[in-house]
């Protein structure tokens, strides 16, 4: 009976994640269309059937492309992608459903984030396509992903060093911020650095390196068609959703986490894509990102040192 309950919970989690991914994708496209005054073709019945026709065209392209592709590699990539998409949600409470309520939740989230970011770049640039230019652009993008993941790791460790009882548990950190004395994380500097690190980690504007490299070498996203495009889109949107919920829980914890996450998703991730501009990968850009990494290091050392002094004296 217990196994049936676990299977039902897993199915509910997967359905909720897929529905959230679909709604977030439609919301993002709608905001971009409204800002650019480009509503769309509105094909038949006020545009209701337009997403269906677009999906049919994508999968027709996939049927043509998959003829020369090894099916074993495709199945392996799909399994790894599914693990990246759904594993992190089992540690995050959706309503009253919490499958894995253990310590070290932030550590698991960090591992999922690192693997998801690295695999998405590898999946696109190093695995599906044999072009040397796409391979080099994927390596450049992966370099900046490593910098962002290192900064996020230090910020997670800073959160742990500021709390005495969380034990890397996201639920304890979130609930502990209900009390005004524990509302220590919502500093302007910490939120700013954490937000920029999350934008860099999700490869969103102004750090949209995947699109920049696509324009340079014509290949990181533009070669995706059909099923590969759907896989990468679901992986990217799910990564942004987990990032938003983590940002809302760690920096604005307490009550109404879902409402705060929706506001952060719109104003923190959608609108920068609307009003921002892309920063190309240059030497100056690399120095800026390394400076961001050292800012995270200094913040971690400062807060960790003050906690050690407080514990000793």
Swiss-Prot record:
It is a multi-pass membrane protein. GO terms for cellular component: mitochondrial inner membrane. It is an enzyme of class 7 (translocase). Pfam families: NADHdh. It is found in: Mitochondrion inner membrane. Its EC number is 7.1.1.2. The chain crosses the membrane at residues 6-26, 31-51, 62-82, 84-104, 109-129, 142-162, 183-203, 216-235, 250-270, 286-306. GO terms for molecular function: NADH dehydrogenase (ubiquinone) activity. Keywords: Electron transport, Membrane, Mitochondrion, Mitochondrion inner membrane, NAD, Respiratory chain, Translocase, Transmembrane, Transmembrane helix, Transport, Ubiquinone. InterPro entries: NADH_UbQ_OxRdtase_su1/FPO, NADH_UbQ_OxRdtase_su1_CS. It catalyses: a ubiquinone + NADH + 5 H(+)(in) = a ubiquinol + NAD(+) + 4 H(+)(out). GO terms for biological process: aerobic respiration. Belongs to the complex I subunit 1 family. Core subunit of the mitochondrial membrane respiratory chain NADH dehydrogenase (Complex I) that is believed to belong to the minimal assembly required for catalysis. Complex I functions in the transfer of electrons from NADH to the respiratory chain. The immediate electron acceptor for the enzyme is believed to be ubiquinone. PANTHER family: NADH DEHYDROGENASE SUBUNIT 1 (PTHR11432), NADH-UBIQUINONE OXIDOREDUCTASE CHAIN 1 (PTHR11432:SF3). This is NADH-ubiquinone oxidoreductase chain 1.
């Amino acid at each position: 009976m217990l196994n049936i309950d676990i299977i039902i919970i897993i199915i509910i989690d997967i359905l909720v994640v897929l529905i959230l991914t679909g709604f977030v994708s439609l919301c993002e496209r709608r905001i971009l269309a409204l800002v650019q005054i480009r509503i769309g073709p509105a094909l038949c019945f006020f545009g209701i059937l337009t997403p269906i026709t677009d999906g049919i065209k994508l999968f027709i392209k996939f049927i043509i492309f998959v003829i020369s592709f090894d099916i074993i590699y495709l199945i392996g990539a799909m399994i790894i992608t599914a693990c990246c998409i759904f594993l992190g949600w089992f540690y995050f409470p959706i309503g009253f459903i919490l499958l894995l309520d253990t310590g070290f939740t932030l550590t698991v989230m960090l591992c999922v984030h690192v693997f998801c970011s690295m695999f998405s770049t590898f999946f696109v640039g190093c695995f599906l396509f044999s072009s040397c230019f796409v391979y080099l652009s994927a390596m450049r993008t992966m370099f900046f992903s490593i910098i962002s993941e290192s900064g996020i790791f230090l910020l997670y460790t800073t959160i742990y060093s500021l709390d005495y009882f969380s034990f890397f548990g996201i639920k304890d950190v979130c609930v502990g911020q209900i009390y005004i004395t524990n509302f220590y994380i919502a500093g302007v500097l910490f939120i700013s650095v954490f937000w920029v690190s999350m934008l860099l980690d999700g490869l969103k504007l102004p750090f949209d390196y995947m699109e920049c490299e696509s324009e340079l070498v014509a290949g990181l996203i533009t070669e995706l068609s059909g099923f590969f495009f759907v896989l990468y889109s679901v992986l990217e949107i799910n990564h942004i959703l987990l990032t938003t919920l983590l940002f809302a829980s760690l920096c604005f914890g307490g009550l109404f986490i879902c409402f705060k996450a929706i506001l952060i998703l719109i104003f923190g991730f959608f609108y920068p894509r609307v009003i921002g501009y892309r920063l190309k990968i240059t030497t100056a850009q690399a120095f800026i990102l390394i400076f961001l990494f050292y800012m995270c290091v200094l913040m971690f050392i400062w807060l960790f040192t003050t906690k050690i002094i407080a514990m000793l004296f």
